[in-house]
Amino acid sequence: MANSNLPRRIIKETQRLLSEPAPGISASPSEDNMRYFNVMILGPTQSPYEGGVFKLELFLPEEYPMAAPKVRFLTKIYHPNIDKLGRICLDILKDKWSPALQIRTVLLSIQALLSAPNPDDPLSENIAKHWKSNEAEAVDTAKEWTRLYASGA
């Protein structure tokens, strides 16, 4: 982790992510940019995403921790709070961000969002409508997309 212009906080958080990974989550910094992380989240058990391996990218802006990390899914996913570009609707990535939060908290919150989709605060209107009108069918579609796009690393 040789990047002397990185704030101590980012170095500490990165060391903790590597030495104490959260269950079902791996996050490793890019070799050429220590503010850019390659993330993998395993689909939570008993969710439509179970068995899936979801790739995400996380970037810490210059203003971090005063500004939230930028995170998006690289793996295609059928979820009311994630759009087709992989952007995530999560309050702590927007107006509820606090400098007290850490990268680890953000990743755990995204993992929790996979367990509990919220069609009442959607980023993808069509998927949210599908989820509200026929949840069982929407869950089946989410399982199918997980099988098609998120199986294997």
Swiss-Prot record:
One of its GO terms (molecular function) is ubiquitin conjugating enzyme activity. GO terms for cellular component: mitochondrion; UBC13-MMS2 complex. Belongs to the ubiquitin-conjugating enzyme family. Catalyzes the synthesis of non-canonical poly-ubiquitin chains that are linked through 'Lys-63'. This type of poly-ubiquitination does not lead to protein degradation by the proteasome. Mediates transcriptional activation of target genes. Required for postreplication repair of UV-damaged DNA and for adapting root developmental programs to suboptimal availability of iron. Induction: Not induced by salt, abscisic acid, mannitol, H(2)O(2), low temperature, MMS or iron. It catalyses: S-ubiquitinyl-[E1 ubiquitin-activating enzyme]-L-cysteine + [E2 ubiquitin-conjugating enzyme]-L-cysteine = [E1 ubiquitin-activating enzyme]-L-cysteine + S-ubiquitinyl-[E2 ubiquitin-conjugating enzyme]-L-cysteine. Pfam families: UQ_con (PF00179). InterPro entries: UBQ-conjugat_E2_core, UBQ-conjugating_AS, UBQ-conjugating_enzyme/RWD. Residues 5-151 form the UBC core domain. Pathway: Protein modification; protein ubiquitination. The gene is UBC35. The active site is at residue 89. Interacts with yeast and human Mms2, with the RING domain of RGLG2 and with UEV1A, UEV1B, UEV1C and UEV1D. This is Ubiquitin-conjugating enzyme E2 35. Ubiquitously expressed at low level. Mainly expressed in the vasculature. It comes from the Eukaryota. Keywords: ATP-binding, Nucleotide-binding, Transferase, Ubl conjugation pathway. Partly functionally redundant with UBC36. GO terms for biological process: postreplication repair; protein ubiquitination; response to iron ion; root epidermal cell differentiation; ubiquitin-dependent protein catabolic process. Disruption phenotype: No visible phenotype under normal growth conditions or in phosphate-deficient plants. Unable to form branched root hairs in response to iron-deficient conditions. Its EC number is 2.3.2.23.
